Curated annotation (Swiss-Prot):
Gene Ontology cellular component annotations, sorted alphabetically: haptoglobin-hemoglobin complex; hemoglobin complex
Role noted for this protein: Involved in oxygen transport from gills to the various peripheral tissues.
Protein's recorded name: Hemoglobin embryonic subunit alpha
Alphabetically ordered keywords of this record: Heme, Iron, Metal-binding, Oxygen transport, Transport
Gene3D superfamilies associated with the record: Globins (1.10.490.10)
Organism: Oryzias latipes
Binding positions (O2): 61
Length: 144
C-alpha cells in the first residue's frame, strides 16, 4: 500500500475543511449507493426496516460513518493507533468483512466527485483515495 506523504495529509486536511459541513449528506449518499450497487452489504443491516437510499437509518448510519472519517482526519498521523477502538468494534462486535471498507471508500470517492466537482481535482482524488485506503487498512488491523 502507498503511504500518505506530508503533502497528501495536507491535501486531505484542506479538502476535509471544505467539505466537512456536508459530511452527513456525503455519508448518507455513499452508504445508500453501496447498499444498491453492492447488495451483499445489506446483510449487515438486516435489522433496519428500510434500506433504501435516503431512508432514516441510512442517513443516520451515514452520519456515523462520516464521524469516523472525521476522527480519522484528526488522527491522520497515526491511523492504526488512533482508530483502534473502531477496529475492535468492527472486528469483534460487528464482525464486518473488511473488504466492505474498500467498497464504502470507493462510494465515498464517487460522492465526493459528484458533490464537489470543482474541488475534487486529480491531486485531491489521489490524496483522498490513499487516505481512505489507509483508513480501511487501519480499520482492518484487528482482523489479523
Amino acid at each position: 500500500m502507498t503511504s500518505l506523504s506530508a503533502k497528501d495529509k495536507d491535501v486531505v486536511k484542506a479538502f476535509w475543511a471544505k467539505i466537512s459541513s456536508k459530511a452527513t449528506d456525503i455519508g448518507a449518499d455513499a452508504l445508500g449507493r453501496m447498499l444498491v450497487v453492492y447488495p451483499q452489504t445489506k446483510t449487515y443491516f438486516a435489522h433496519w426496516k428500510d434500506l433504501s437510499p435516503g431512508s432514516a437509518p441510512v442517513k443516520k448510519h451515514g452520519q456515523t460513518v462520516m464521524g469516523g472519517v472525521a476522527e480519522a482526519v484528526g488522527k491522520i498521523d497515526n491511523l492504526t493507533a488512533g482508530l483502534l477502538n473502531l477496529s475492535e468494534l468492527h472486528a469483534f462486535t460487528l464482525r464486518v468483512d473488511p473488504a466492505n471498507f474498500k467498497i464504502l471508500s470507493h462510494n465515498i470517492l464517487v460522492v465526493l466527485a459528484i458533490m464537489f466537482p470543482n474541488d475534487f481535482t486529480p491531486e485531491v482524488h489521489v490524496a483522498m483515495d490513499k487516505f481512505l485506503a489507509a483508513l480501511a487498512l487501519a480499520l482492518a488491523e484487528k482482523y489479523r
